[in-house]
A protein has these predicted regions:
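Bacterial Sec-dependent N-terminal signal peptides
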Residues: 1-28
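Membrane-proximal, proline-rich intrinsically disordered regions
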Residues: 21-61
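Short, conserved phosphate-binding/catalytic loop or strand-edge motifs used
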Residues: 141-148, 195
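Proline-centered turn/helix-capping motifs that create local helix->coil transitions or kinks
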Residues: 21-22, 58-63, 131-140
């Protein structure tokens, strides 16, 4: 009887000890808003891919290497380019920028957060600058869209003037947040001022 009581007591004690373990942990191999956007290096990593919005230097250099017609214009003249085959209507980077702006407030370091928020505002302005340059009127999105939000997904184009006013507001925010120290590889206050001009 004593052995049974001892065994039962140890079993119950073991159950209590192991049931108090917190096994509801976030996976360390995946990103989520709850586990990311917590510090400067994470904000920097997220905003680094915004730089792919800039034209590739290789393409610019190749265009000037000969006296032939530029490949983009050449494709248009040969009839190979159409709205369906052109990659200029992609909105992926805008989603990434808006996603960042919705979640960056989780970083407790306000100074670092403002710097990278400035990068995001600059690139949202640059994104729309390029869209207006290519297409004229476009829809303005300043939030992440859900795939089931038909009303926002089918939003009509807005007047160019409204879009450019929003671009200027984003540039003003970026100018106030970006560092003033010159940098050859990162956007700064001076980059934003150049785009605004």
């Amino acid at each position: 009887m004593n052995k049974n009581n001892l065994f039962s007591s140890l079993t119950l004690l073991g159950l209590f000890v192991f049931s108090s373990c917190n096994l509801d942990l976030a996976p360390e191999d995946t990103l989520s808003p709850k586990t990311y956007f917590k510090n400067g290096p994470q904000l920097e990593l997220w905003t680094n891919h915004f730089y792919s919005l800039f034209p590739d230097v290789d393409d610019l250099a190749k265009q000037n290497a000969d006296d032939n017609i530029s490949s983009e214009l050449g494709e248009t003249l040969m009839g190979q380019r159409s709205a369906a085959s052109e990659n200029g209507w992609t909105w992926e980077r805008l989603r990434d920028i808006n996603y960042y702006l919705q979640h960056s407030n989780q970083c407790p370091d306000e100074h670092v957060r403002k710097q990278y928020d400035g990068v995001a505002y600059f690139f949202r302005a640059y994104f729309y600058f390029d869209k207006v340059k290519r297409y004229g009127d476009v829809p303005w999105y300043d939030q992440v869209l859900n795939s089931n939000d038909d009303k926002l997904l089918a939003k009509p184009r807005q007047d160019r003037e409204i879009i450019m006013d929003s671009v200027m507001q984003d540039l003003d925010k970026a100018i106030g947040m970006l560092p003033t120290k010159k940098d050859q590889v990162r956007v700064t206050k001076w980059t934003a001022l150049a785009l605004k001009s």
